[in-house]
Amino acid sequence: MEANTIFVQIASYRDPQLIPTLEDMLEHADNPENLVVCVCWQHSADDEPIEIFLDKGFLPTRYYEDEEMGYNIIVMEKDGATFKIIDLDYNDTEGACWARYQIQRQYDGEKYTLQLDSHHRFVPEWDTKVIEMLESLRSEECPKPLLTAYIPSFDPENDPGARVQVPWKMDFDRFIPEGAVFFRPSAIDHWKDLDKPMASRFYSAHFCFADGIFCEEVPHDPEYFFHGEEISIAVRAYTWGYDLFHPHRIIAWHEYTRKGRTKIWDDHTTPEKNAGKVKLDWVERNNLCHKRNRILFGMDGEDPSQIDFGRFGFGTVRTVRQYEEHAGISFEHRGVQQATLDRLDPPNNVEYEDEEEWKASFARSNDVHVCVHKDAIEVVDDFDFFFVGAHDENGEEIHRKDLGKEEIYKYLNSPNGFIDYRMIFLSAKRPASYTVWPHSESRGWMEKLDFPLDY
């Protein structure tokens, strides 16, 4: 293999930005001949025929069948780069993580790997810059650096004018009810003062650069669907000895809006399943994925030993507890430490003597789905507010955030008639129920509605 070969991984689902992304990658690469790009091309022959490649100068050189999986792979060349296109009807895919795993099966010893989505733009000489950045981190104390981030955004309809020119990092957002951790991007405020990448708690599936062997050591679990992908890879990578970092300079941009793209949840629906076009609908796959993620982390009383995760489990270089200490989150308690909320650089280094002190260092991250149809409420024309509160198992109020008049009637007059939103908050205790209690200017308190939370 060439010394600085890069195995580029791109899972693309019916994305009109795929070809522009590949062209921009090639145009701005310093050494395109070092690129081996594998695309899991989940597409419809009607709106994405092979001509979208041929018309842009991609030259097919070989065509063969993956006998184990039953799909075809088209090998192409352009500008010295090699492309392996996994040709897959969009009805045959099993989700983003499954597609990423199919790509990783094509890894062939390249020195580095870069995982992306199919909607990016790149800085000039991006390949040289990202290699230099990674190698600047390598040492005896850090033998396996990994670069990752929710990279800054661009807009294909206003490009390059709308490109954000500040590098981004990843901050904790919340534990969702199903158990996965969500993140949000934010600017690296002091990026101009940095001469190296900054330490990271988390991993992004749309930008990850590491040694090529990462494809084999921490492969995507094909039984994951979407949510849970990034937090599971973050912890698995950390336990395999990888140290996570955010780039301190921009390498590429990502398109976040999904505008103009058909998504898998638009296609893999219950009617399509009933018609025999897909094996499972996206909701079924999503629920199975969430269950698998909770089992992996032993959340909500799940026993991790009920599944043999094999190569999709944790590594042996570090423990999950060491990751939790680094990141300042607790899977068992769905907890987050203040330093993580304050967006301070990791590791948190919180000292504790025993499990009680460890637990006490966290606030519980809650995401309560409030959902009430107007038919459950006696609707009057002079509501002034709704009490909305969460309670623990003893009925004690642990959070309250009322709805005002404008919000109330916006929901009640909506086409579906649902009061439907998420109540996100921190607390010391676990919420067991929530209450919606309407108040009228003329009638005072009306019927109180209580809803248990099912974990």
Located regions from the model:
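Terminal low-complexity segments of carbohydrate-biosynthetic enzymes
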Residues: 159-161, 182-195, 199-209, 261-455
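Catalytic cores of eukaryotic secretory-pathway lumenal/extracellular enzymes that build
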Residues: 2-310
